[in-house]
Structures are given as structure tokens and as C-alpha cells.
Amino acid sequence: MNSLRDYNDELKDNEGRKYNYNFDINVMHHYMLKSMFPFFKDGNLLELGSSMGIFTERFIPYFDDITCIEASAEAINMAKKRFKEKVNFVHSLFENVILDKKYDNIIMTHVLEHLDDPISVLKRVNNEWLSDNGRFFLICPNANAPSRQIAVKMGLISHNSAVTEAEKKHGHRKTYSLDTLEQEAKDAGLNVIYRTGIFFKALANFQWDRLLETDIITKEYLEGCYQLGQQYPDLCSSIFLVCEKDKK
């Protein structure tokens, strides 16, 4: 990350995009955790980029030892009010942080696309922070989500992997697909043991937010979108890798 960036400002909603949609918090966070849970290891947890701690809260029942690294001081202050002493927060850039132990579970959710030099940070995960038998959970927005492909056909976005102006204001640097995400993980020395998508998604986040205010969408429909996403990972809202240290 670039020390000249204003990470507090990047958290703010802008005219083209909210930073957090209800769809993210109430739907995607549930299915992200559901996707990760079978792969959790016993031990501690490091979350890379915790923002205000909204997703962090879902890990409390599963881990007693949680550390979060976050670049935004404002986000950390809000998160500390939420968790008190339950979570250890470190205000730092990933490039600069010094950690005094290794972690059995490391989670990075919708953060890698914000980094100026993602491979260097992934190398730190592999070489410095991940325990020998630990697992790294990496989730990013998907360039090939149908909602995004439809936006391209509508002329709203130039191409699937484009970074929109609204995304740039939120600090996005690139938009990953499964192949580009996996390649960067491998370039950093990580061993990808599992890959999938999370939640088939044909509507934009703001459209989902409107639908969720009605009785049109049922829990069964949401579960159906999740299950369909397992069959068609390249057409999901998010893409997901589980990685371990390369044993070679």
C-alpha cells in the first residue's frame, strides 16, 4: 500500500458506490463464512484488512485469539468500540507491520484488490505469517460475475476486469478473475488447495439491497444462489481460494 493514500477517505460512500451494502453484510458475509468454515484450522486467526470489524464479528464464536491489521485509524477506532478487548487491532500497512508470532488461519476478504503490490504482501503471508500447517483464506470480488458482465453489455463498464471510477475512490487497483487470482497466489509461493466461487449473482449490489427490503427473496432462494455458485464458480459474486504453504 502507498503511505500517501488516505485510507480513512477510501472507506466513505461515494456518488457511484457504497462501501458496504446490506447485500454484503447480510448475505455475502454469511456465505463467505459458510465457505471457509470446513477449512478452518484449530488455533489463532489473523484478519488482513478488518475495516470496521463488521465481518470480524462473525469469527468471535470460532476463535479465542484474533488479531486484525487495518490501515484506517478511523475504522480501528470504530471496531475497538464494537469488540473492547476481545480482538487485538494493529494499525499498520501490511508492508510495514511486524508480527511476533505465526497464525494458523489468515483471512483476507475483499482486500487484495486494494493493494498497490499484492504479490509482495502475499509473499509475507507465505514466508512470515502463516504457520507451517496453517491455511490462508483469500476472497476477492469477481470480474466475471454476471452482474458485472451485464454492466459491460449495457456500456456502463468497458470490460469485465475494469476498475470503475467509484471503485478507484474506494481504493481498488484491479479486478480479479479466478485465473488471475490463482496466478498471483502461486507467484507468491502459496499452494492453492481449493478454489470456488461464492454466490451466483446476476444483479448489482444496489439492486440486491432493494430486493432484500421486500418479501420477494426467500432464504431458500439465497441458498439456491449459493449452491448454483458451487456449480458455476466463474459466475459468482466473489471468488475464493484456500491456500497453504508450498510443501516443495
What are these regions (language model features)?
Residues 110-114:
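Short catalytic micro-motifs in class I SAM-dependent methyltransferases
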